[in-house]
Amino acid sequence: MPHDAPEHSHTGISPSGHPYRADQDAPLSYFQNMEIAMRELLSEKGIATEAEINAEIDRMDSRSPADGARLVARFWVDPAFRERVRADASAASREMGFDIGALRLIAVENTENVHNVIVCTLCSCYPRNLLGFPPDWYKQRAYRSRVVKTPRSVLREFGLDLPGDVQVRVHDSTADMRYIVIPARPTGTADLNETALAALVTRDSMIGVARAQSPA
């Protein structure tokens, strides 16, 4: 069919070398149909308007690893807050204004001798309220099954080769209990403020497959 778009390849690969996203032409799934039916029912019953539902979706979509990074940075610089996170990470998160819902959040701290990594072996439970949407690899069966059995091997695939004397602990998230890794504070950051420290904290470091970045 003729069109006026610029010349492009039909190999499925973009000029930058990345594959084009597949067309979403398949019929709606069971869960998609259920979502539509639920939205209509909530509206018909006067429980929530379409605008309220969309606002909540926008609020959830706006969450990102930057929220978790702020919590980690404050953990590093504020001894009193650090103890509150250790005692009740859910309450400490709410203290910073993060709405994490009713779930129980547990912070696991990396040290010189212990490295933590999180997974959900059953599905893809993830601290979305602090980190946003999980990466695709976190949801894949390969990661979920292998990181429990051979965590060091999986971490090496992410470029993280831990010394043999460092203990690796794998934490399995559930529907009502989530984990966040507090990465070890990088050396050479004693003079950095909380905002600068938060910029060093990555999503992967809060999952446990990477370290926090070193200052430039």
Predicted feature descriptions by range:
Residues 2-216:
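Terminal, compositionally biased segments used for targeting/anchoring and flexible tails
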